Amino acid sequence: RKGTDMGGIMIDLDDFKSINDVYGHSTGDDALIDAARVMRLALPDTAMLMRFAGDEFIILIKTGDSEEIEDCVRNIRSSLREFNETSGRKYKLSFSIGTSIFRSGMTSDSFLKEMDSNMYIEKNQKHYERHPSVRTVNG
């Protein structure tokens, strides 16, 4: 879709608390730095990466084209796979990702909520894949 000039990506580090609990907060700090580096390397110059809260990041991209946003997501996932295969770290990073396009009539709050909601859809899918017995009859 075109016609707007901003897209957003919200990224949450999956199981970040476990990294802190198992390896300590210093290693958790390293994981946050590594995560930011993985994202930054995958983004175009038109993107701005920000730490939003705790283990969440937001990326704003000067495009309203959903294909360009999805390209960024694919690049981030590819960069993440490469990091996990080559870093030698004792932890593996995993991201849950949600996107949105800032559309006419949206507020900044609704833009953030849409990214967050889409990110939690992915996070919940990952949880059900790891713990299938938790899934309800209705799905």
Residue ranges, per PLM feature:
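Conserved long alpha-helical elements within nucleotide-processing catalytic cores of c-di-GMP signaling
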Residues: 1-7, 14-44, 50-54, 58-59, ...
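Conserved Rossmann-like nucleotide-binding pocket used by diverse enzymes
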Residues: 9, 60, 98
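Gram-positive cell-envelope targeting signals
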Residues: 10, 138-139
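Residues immediately flanking
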Residues: 13, 63, 97
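Catalytic-core segments of nucleotide cyclases and related cyclic-nucleotide turnover enzymes
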Residues: 21, 70-77, 81, 87-88, ...
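Short beta-strand-to-loop capping motifs
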Residues: 59-64, 101-103
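PAS and PAS-like sensory/regulatory domains
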Residues: 91-96
